[in-house]
Amino acid sequence: MRYTFFRFLLAAALLGPVATTATRAAEVVELRQPNAAKVVVKLQFRNGSAADPVGKEGLTYLTSQLVTEGGTKDLTSAQLKDLLYPMAARYYATTDKEVTTFTFEFHKDFIDKFYPVLRGLMLTPSFTQEDFDRLKSNQLNYVEQVIRASSDEDYSKFALEDQLFRGSRYQHMTRGTAAGVKSITLADVKQYYATAFGTDNLTIGLAGNYPASFAKQLEADLKKLPKSSVKTPIPVAAMPNGIHVEIISKPDALGSAVYAGFPIKTTRADDDFAALMVANSWLGEHRKSYGKLYDKIRTTRSMNYGDYSYIEWYEAGGSNMLPVPGVPRHANYASLWLRPVQIAEGLRKQYPSELGDLKVGHAPFALRLAVREMDNVVKNGLSKEDFERTRTFLRSYVKLYGTTPAKQLGFLLDSRFYGRKNWLQDVDAQLAKLTLDDVNRAMRKHWQVQNMFVTIVTDDSEAQPLADVLKNNTPSPMSYANVVKAGLPKEVVAEDAEVANYKLNVTEVKVINTNDTFR
């Protein structure tokens, strides 16, 4: 009876209020591909985790997951899996700070069979207590345990955003906080879905081989969604006075994961972004070995697995080789990602006779080297040769961003978010007409190294010695085994000495217990 009553209320909401106020129709973006075998539907709502109610951090994520991981009024989640298996269809939801996107992919021959599933999930989701309890438990486990244990790299990135956006609705992870997730009830989810996912904050995307009648039916059915009363606030990232460092101390960390960043006032909506793409690619293109950071830290000194730079949020950098759509943001920042470097305890065990007295590991040296490289390129600019080579690479590389219909459609939806028609086409044209002066001017305008936030996730044995070195700007010589040191080129030895004494504008250092994060 309780669920039947809820479905009646939700259905009434989805049919829309009996009022004279017109609701904005959802924008429709189509990418017709007559030779494609697959159909892709993306429903992007302009509400993300930043729209989570205060005290309910994680509600947007949990709601979206309950839609796609639950059932409909006619079919349970288990029945849906059995129904869809022969179709090889799939669907999922992603939530970022400002948007939530539902993606449906299926073969064109199954349009008639699959569409009732899509319609049922979006218009009459079952929202059962059983599904809610299961998904809430998984989400809480991630916030309380998984993020701290599975990847110190992701941990450091989310902790940096906690610093950058502290006090704003961007601060918490998309999955929320421990207290926020614990407080969410099934009633919260039902109410939030009925008020936050509306036709007036929706962009409908279709790609592939589908009849015009399908597009019309989809648009007509989604008009039954109510008008949204939830708006996502757009914060401004804080600019610190100096370099603020937060060191997260955790037991049994095998290295120091470093992530640093500062706000920038440019996004894909701005033409300056293309110029920064060239500078960023030269400094540290994601998962590419030719970047300056990678060359200096990994290739030359074998300090870690890789080092990269960014001019916008990069989703799941540990697994994605190329940028993915679905994470557009208005509040932006530049960042440096240094994959974990060795701590003193590990180096002492590895080289007891040579480094037995070592007090701190490689993190201070790596941070200094990375910041110094950014500092140098801002001051000195790119050379003509580096500019031409990097721009040529990027004009080819961005064409790989949309290698599937789903990605192509996703980038088209993101383009609308930024006020553009087709960003992938726009950026190629922008790169084509860029000059070296454009790039060097953009770096001087948007990049600097005097004010930034730094997050380091490290072992509890390393945290305080590391904090002391950074707070006091103590020189941090690179630590090599004797056999490695003996074979170093003279130019590397000379550069090491300069890096070890490079002054960071550190004005604040805090050590935080891992149990006190994301509460």
Task: Identify what each model region corresponds to.
Residues 7-18:
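Bacterial N-terminal signal peptides
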Residues 18-25:
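Sec/Tat signal peptide C-region and signal peptidase I cleavage site
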Residues 31, 36-62, 68, 76-123, ...:
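M16 family metallopeptidases and their MPP-like homologs
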Residues 1-7:
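Positively charged n-region of N-terminal signal peptides that target proteins for export
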Residues 166, 199, 203-266, 458-462, ...:
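An aromatic/glycine/proline-enriched structural segment found at the starts
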Residues 433-442, 446:
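A short, acidic, amphipathic alpha-helical segment used as a generic capping/interface helix at domain edges
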